[in-house]
Amino acid sequence: MYGPKDHGWIEVVAGPMYSGKTEELIRRIRRAEIAKQKVQVFKPEIDNRYSKQDVVSHAGDKIQSVPVKSSKEILEKLLDDTDVIGIDEAQFFDDSLVEIVSKIANNNRRVICAGLDMDFKGEPFGPMPKLMAIAEFVDKIQAVCMVCNNPATRTQRLINGKPAKKSDPVVLIGAQESYEARCRKCHCVPR
């Protein structure tokens, strides 16, 4: 999506783990670069699974990013000539991300946020619900359920091969060994 320079907007790519959110973010950023637009990509500093510096998809696609400690730091590190801003793992930021993203879009810039819309409990995750509400464009993508192969909309956390309990902490960064994509029917959160 490219538009006139006098319009900004917000795009959100949401879904469970292994649905291709980061791949889609990278694809959109690369297309903006092809369109000769200046881009910057940000990610939360706590996301260091595959790289401390780059945004990396589970499939191995990667793009250079600026790791930040807080959403406010995005404004501090945002360059004046940037046209398109990518934000990966948006769910890990606090609610001030919503105001910051709005401010950036109101300054005639395109903002693309990617993140989990629900936590492992199946509940709205961080600022994602509000970002989805204010965005001009929302793509909710699915993965494949690792149990029944139907479309998956949820992320199942596994601890020693068993579903995590509702009382477990929400934030625990991991990869395949601790998470699976699941459909509504196969998703399980014991009390």
Curated annotation (Swiss-Prot):
Q: Where does ATP bind?
A: 15-22, 88-91
Q: Which reaction does it catalyse?
A: thymidine + ATP = dTMP + ADP + H(+)
One family from Pfam that matches here is TK
Q: Which residues form the signal peptide?
A: none
A GO CC annotation given for this chain? cytosol
Where does this polypeptide localize? Answer: Cytoplasm
E.C. numbers:
2.7.1.21
Q: Report a single Gene Ontology molecular function.
A: ATP binding
Q: How does it assemble?
A: Homotetramer.
Q: What is this protein called?
A: Thymidine kinase
Give the gene name.
tdk
